[in-house]
Amino acid sequence: MEKFLVIAGPCAIESEELLLKVGEEIKRLSEKFKEVEFVFKSSFDKANRSSIHSFRGHGLEYGVKALRKVKEEFGLKITTDIHESWQAEPVAEVADIIQIPAFLCRQTDLLLAAAKTGRAVNVKKGQFLAPWDTKNVVEKLKFGGAKEIYLTERGTTFGYNNLVVDFRSLPIMKQWAKVIYDATHSVQLPGGLGDKSGGMREFIFPLIRAAVAVGCDGVFMETHPEPEKALSDASTQLPLSQLEGIIEAILEIREVASKYYETIPVK
């Protein structure tokens, strides 16, 4: 069985100090869980915040520098997201995986720019997109030269200010790419607090259990030492102190469920 992928880190690059604190813990976990491939994630620009008054970040230059510090200090792989095509090249200098935001998952120029860098590309499936439509996204990336492609399930719009996860999407999307389950954004209530998104953190672990049982290739979890003080996604980030326990549970569930991943499909 391949290593299980865990993408984790604070939602936004609030400070270099925060990144190093979280990076130190993820490095420790990487030494404990040898069957897991860890990738450190944080965003230099939260470009689609609900309100103009919300914290966006410190910009590309600061972000790349801070992420490089984490990479050099702890030897962790790095991922971050881009929002415009011109950002692909400078981000590729530090990122091992380039992330495409859900709202931008169909933007052809952005996908091609990410693919052109030669880095792995992880596309968040839009909240508006059917799982079978991600095949077109993958074809665009392959056309651009991408060799390592991930698709991330992060919930589907379910009326106003709500998301629901349809776990059928995991085996559907696995037909053309490796599939990641986004455990923290999937429990968001988009715009649910008026000028910012809310969320239901208590459902992070129940839905992770389901995703691993169905058979995802990895999980994405935004994590923060003090989520209630986070400058973005305060309602859904996982407390850093709980990350280790969740990974232990993931591996136990995967060990049992993996025996049945390749069963004969019922038709």
Swiss-Prot record:
Q: Report the domain of life of the source organism.
A: Bacteria
Extract the InterPro entries matched here: Aldolase_TIM (IPR013785), DAHP1/KDSA (IPR006218), KDO8P_synthase (IPR006269)
Where in or outside the cell it occurs: the entry states: Cytoplasm
Biological process terms from the Gene Ontology for this record are: keto-3-deoxy-D-manno-octulosonic acid biosynthetic process; monosaccharide biosynthetic process
Enzyme Commission code(s) on record: 2.5.1.55
GO terms assigned for molecular function = 3-deoxy-8-phosphooctulonate synthase activity
Which catalysed reactions does the entry list for this protein? D-arabinose 5-phosphate + phosphoenolpyruvate + H2O = 3-deoxy-alpha-D-manno-2-octulosonate-8-phosphate + phosphate
A cellular component annotation (GO) from this entry: cytosol
Q: Entry's Pfam families? A: DAHP_synth_1 (PF00793)
Q: In which pathway does it act?
A: Carbohydrate biosynthesis; 3-deoxy-D-manno-octulosonate biosynthesis; 3-deoxy-D-manno-octulosonate from D-ribulose 5-phosphate: step 2/3; Bacterial outer membrane biogenesis; lipopolysaccharide biosynthesis
Q: Which UniProt keywords apply?
A: Cytoplasm, Lipopolysaccharide biosynthesis, Transferase
> Does Manganese appear among the keywords?
no
Describe its assembly: Oligomer.
PANTHER family from the UniProt entry: PHOSPHO-2-DEHYDRO-3-DEOXYHEPTONATE ALDOLASE
Similarity field: Belongs to the KdsA family.
Q: What is this protein called?
A: 2-dehydro-3-deoxyphosphooctonate aldolase
